[in-house]
Regions:
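Terminal amphipathic alpha-helical/low-complexity segments used for targeting or macromolecular assembly
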Residues: 79, 86-95
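Structural signal for interior beta-strand "rungs" in well-ordered beta-sheet cores
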Residues: 1-81
Length: 95
């Protein structure tokens, strides 16, 4: 995980995840990750992108683009599926 990455609350990051900096191009920089995000094993999140709130990134996904709130992202290249309860049963919040 690049130390310049901004990570929100209730974020789960599993084994083998790379959250990195892109050193050139339009997306030069590090990711910003919202609240209530679940990032699956061996996923890659790279560049000055924004991952919204309530997002599930499936294992092995490659993300180098902005992801809106309430989404599931899977595959390489990543494909976005809109889902209101994306992280339900993956992230427990205590209120």
């Amino acid at each position: 995980i690049n130390p310049k990455t901004k990570i929100g609350e209730n974020v789960t990051i599993l084994n083998g995840v790379l959250i990195g900096q892109q050193n050139r191009g339009r997306k030069q920089g590090c990711p910003t990750i919202g609240n209530k995000v679940w990032i699956g094993t061996n996923s890659i999140v790279v560049g000055a992108i924004h991952i919204g709130n309530n997002v599930l990134i499936a294992p092995g996904a490659y993300i180098n683009f902005d992801v809106p709130d309430n989404s599931i992202v899977l595959g390489n290249p990543g494909t976005i599926i809109s889902k209101q309860d994306a992280t339900d049963s993956y992230i427990t919040t205590y209120e």
